[in-house]
C-alpha cells in the first residue's frame, strides 16, 4: 500500500515547486519508488500554460507524473455544485497513475486572489486521498513567534490538533531578501531599488525548529545562486535579436548593470555573471566589456538597447572577444523601457534549464529531514533500487565520510578549478591543485569561483626538487638519473603520482587535458598494481533513468585473454558491490549460451568458467548477447535458465573495441550520464578523465577516487 504525502502551500510565493522538486530528490536519493500526482493544474500566465511542476518533472526525470485537471474544468464542476464528481475523478486519476509506487507525492494548489477556494479544495483532496499533510510556508518578514502563529493558523484550517494526518511543515526561503509586505525581492540591479529596500532577517534555523507547533521536516535557506538565470532566457523574455550567440545557452546572469556612467566608474561591474545593459551607440562600453572578456572575465551577457546598428569596424575589433563565448543581444526599446521589461522577468526555473533544476533539487534536498524520508518506507519490504540520484548521493556521502586528499595535476585548468571548489563546498574531498598559484587564482576569479578552505594549491616549481631522490630510487633499475628525473618531474602527473606514492595524498585524478596514456603510465611505473591483481582495468557507471549499470572494460585493455577477462569480471563485480550495486555479471558476446562457435565466443565461455571457479560467491553467466542480458522478455526465450539474463547489472565486454563502442553508443543515443572510467587493480587509486569532461564529471570522479582510497585502507587493515 502506497503512502500518500500532500504538500500544501499556506499562501502565495512559498516556493512550492522548488520544495516539491527537493522532496522528490530526497526520496530518489534514498531509493524510494515514487509517483507524483498534481490533481489540478496551477493556473499561470494564461490558463492554457502547462502546470510548472508537472512540466519540470517530465523534462528532467523518468518519474511518473499524471496530467493534472485543467482549472477551467474544475471551476465549471464547482460552480455547478459537482464537487463530489470532481473528487471521484481525482481518485480515479490517482489510482490510474500511481500503481507500484511506495510513496505518492501530491502537490496542492496555491491559494490566489482569483482562486481563494484553493485551501478548502486542498483540504478536501487530502481527506479524499487519506494523505499525510505537510505544509509549505515561507518565512517572509515574520519573527519566529509570528511564524509559529501562522503555522498554528494553517493547522487549524485543516482540522487542528485532532487531524492526525498533519505530519509537519517545511519552511522555505529562510532569510530571503523581503520587502515590507514580506515578498521576496532578489536584488539583481541597482535600477530596481526604491524606497522600500529589501531586508534580510538572519534568523537562526534552530529557533524555528524549537518554536514550531508541529514537526519541522525541512528548513531551506534562501540561495541567490538558485535564481541565476541563463542569458538565453533573458533574451527570449525581451524578444531580443542575437548579435553574437556565444555561450548564450549556458552563461548565467547573476546581476544586471545599466552602463550609463563613464568607463572608469563602470569597471567594477565588469564581473562574472553580469548582464551589462548599454545603449548600442556606446561603443566604448562594448569595447571595454570585450577587453574584460578577452582577459578571462566570464561576463554573463551584453544587452544593447536602442536598436542602433553596430559599426562594422567595432564588430571586427570585438571579434576575438566574441569567440570567447560572450553573448550579445539587442532590443529596439530604449534603456528606460528595457529596464521596465527586465523588472517583469519571471525568475521561475524554466523546465528545459536542466542544470538549474538539478542544482535546485540537490540544494533543497540537502535541507529536508533524512529521518522523515527514511520513515516513509521503514515498513516496506521492497528492495531499494539504486536510481541515478541515489547513486550520486551515495557517492557524495561515502566520499564525505572518507575525508581524503585528492591531487589534481591539471590545477590551472578552468573545469578542474570549478570542480575543486564544488568538492570543497560539498565536503567531498580536499583537492590539491598543482600549478602556479597566481594563475590558478586568476582563472578562479575570472570564473567567479572562490577557492576557500578545502582547496590547497601547491606550486610545482617550489616542491619538485624534493621528489627527485625518490623517483631515482624507484626507477634506478631502468637507469633513472637525477637529470632525467628532473625532466620527468616537469610533468605534473609524475609529480602528483610521487605525492600519492609517498602517501602525501590519497588519490589522483587527471585527464581533462592529458591523454589516458599520460595519466596512467606514471602510476603503472611508480605505484604498480594492487596485491592479487595482474592487470589494471576500468569500468563506467552508466546512469540509466531507473537504475545504474556497470560496463567494463571500455577504456584500458585492447584484447584481453580469457584469464584477463575473468579478472576484469571479478574486479568489476567487486567495484559494483562497493558502490551499492548488487553484482549480476553478464559476459557479453555475439552469441548466447551454446548457440555459437568461434574463437571469440570460446574466449568468453572460458573466461566465464574461470571467473566462476575463482569466485563461486558471485553470480556470473555467459556468453550472453546484450539484449538477452538486459531484457527480461528476450532472456525468457534465449536463456531461460540463466541466473543473470534479463537482470544483469554488470556487463563485461570481450574487448576494447566492443566495450568502448557500446558505451558511447548507449550514452549518446539515450542521452545518459556516465561516470568514469574508474580504474581498478591499482595499489592506490588513480582515475582518468575524458578530455571532454564536464565539471560534474570531475566532481564525481574525485568522489569515486576518495571512496576507492577508503576501501583500499579498509582492505589493508
Swiss-Prot record:
GO terms for molecular function: phosphate acetyltransferase activity. One of its GO terms (cellular component) is cytoplasm. It comes from the Bacteria. The keyword Cell division does not apply. Pathway: Metabolic intermediate biosynthesis; acetyl-CoA biosynthesis; acetyl-CoA from acetate: step 2/2. InterPro entries: DRTGG, P-Actrans_bac, P-loop_NTPase, P_AcTrfase, P_AcTrfase_dom1, P_AcTrfase_dom2, Phos_Acetyltrans/Butyryltrans, PTA_PTB. Residues 390-717 are annotated as: Phosphate acetyltransferase. Transmembrane segments: none annotated. Its EC number is 2.3.1.8. It is found in: Cytoplasm. Pfam families: AAA_26, DRTGG, PTA_PTB. It catalyses: acetyl-CoA + phosphate = acetyl phosphate + CoA. Keywords: Acyltransferase, Cytoplasm, Transferase. One of its GO terms (biological process) is acetyl-CoA biosynthetic process. In the N-terminal section; belongs to the CobB/CobQ family. The N-terminal region seems to be important for proper quaternary structure. The C-terminal region contains the substrate-binding site. Homohexamer. Involved in acetate metabolism. This is Phosphate acetyltransferase. It comes from Yersinia pestis. The gene is pta.
